[in-house]
Design a protein with these regions (language model features):
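Structural signature of alpha-solenoid helical repeat scaffolds
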Residues: 25, 63, 102-105, 147, ...
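TPR-adjacent "capping" and linker segments in tetratricopeptide-repeat scaffold/adaptor proteins
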Residues: 17-33, 61-67
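Conserved alpha-helical positions within TPR/SEL1-like repeat arrays
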Residues: 35-43, 66-81, 108-123, 150-165, ...
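Alpha-helical segment of the N-proximal tetratricopeptide repeat
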Residues: 29-60, 77-83
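Amphipathic alpha-helical segments of tetratricopeptide repeats
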Residues: 57-59, 96-101, 138-143, 180-185, ...
């Protein structure tokens, strides 16, 4: 695997070709392995290299290959990570068009792509379109799956985020609570995603001035994060800071100083 380690440290085109040819020959172009390598490159933050990799793979596929829609989706993720939001939307739209031609209207891929499109609109500050896309994802998943499908937790969380940004705090709270309820069904009690949900709910209570409820949810978040994350993880530091600010608003300056300093 030395060829892979070498290539991941370089963005040069000849290194990319070397890596791609190696993977194609070793794994006979098995989709799972090629996808895994592309994901590894992307997750390392080497977005330009990931884009070249996906494009090279795309160029070798016949026009009717079922992997094309997946590659469009992955290119959309790369463009999103690079902050190229309009390009990301174009890739996602291409992926969506293929899925709508080749799958039933309630297929999981279609709902997931609507969610991805919503994420990009949210980053562009277009909350209306983001909410529209998230609601489409929810509607499709309700038709095809149980209302407590794990992905619904993500959709509800995203809707809650939009409502919080729009200062519709009670609506935000409702969707964050729905997201948390689903996560509890599938995740271990100390999973970091539960810590995120408690933190999000605490943030909304903060906006509503419900400081005792804020501290309750921040404490729950902190307990989970201390168990599941490295000691120096920024989410832990953020939770301490948030709790310190709440104590400051409650005029408990001693506790505030301990947490903030």
């Amino acid at each position: 695997m030395s060829i892979i380690r070498m290539t991941l440290c370089s963005d040069r085109d000849n290194d990319l070709k070397q890596l791609y040819d190696h993977m194609k020959n070793e794994y006979d172009r098995e989709e799972t392995n090629l996808l895994s390598l592309g994901d590894a490159i992307r997750n390392m933050g080497k977005f330009d290299l990931a884009e070249k990799y996906y494009r090279r793979w795309l160029s070798e596929l016949p026009s009717n290959d079922p992997s094309i829609g997946v590659l469009y989706q992955l290119l959309g993720r790369v463009a999103n990570a690079k902050g190229e939001y309009d390009t990301s939307l174009e890739w996602y739209q291409k992926s969506l068009e293929i899925d709508m031609r080749t799958h039933p209207s309630d297929h999981v891929n279609i709902g997931s792509t609507h969610n991805s499109i919503g994420n990009v609109h949210g980053k562009k500050g277009d909350r209306g379109r983001a909410l529209e896309s998230y609601n489409r994802a929810v509607s499709l998943f309700k038709q095809a799956h149980d209302e407590n499908h794990p992905k619904m937790a993500m959709f509800y969380n995203n809707i809650g985020l939009i409502y919080r940004e729009e200062k519709k705090y009670f609506e935000a709270l409702d969707f964050y609570e729905k997201s948390l309820a689903i996560k509890k069904k599938y995740l271990p009690m100390d999973h970091p995603n539960l810590g995120t949900s408690y933190n999000n709910i605490g943030n909304v209570h903060y906006c509503l001035g419900h400081y005792d409820l804020v501290l309750d949810h921040y404490n729950r978040s902190l307990k989970i994060r201390l168990k599941s994350l490295p000691a120096q993880h920024p989410d832990i530091a953020m939770t301490y800071r948030n709790m310190g600010l709440v104590y400051e608003y409650k005029d408990d300056f001693e506790k505030s100083l301990i947490l903030l300093w």
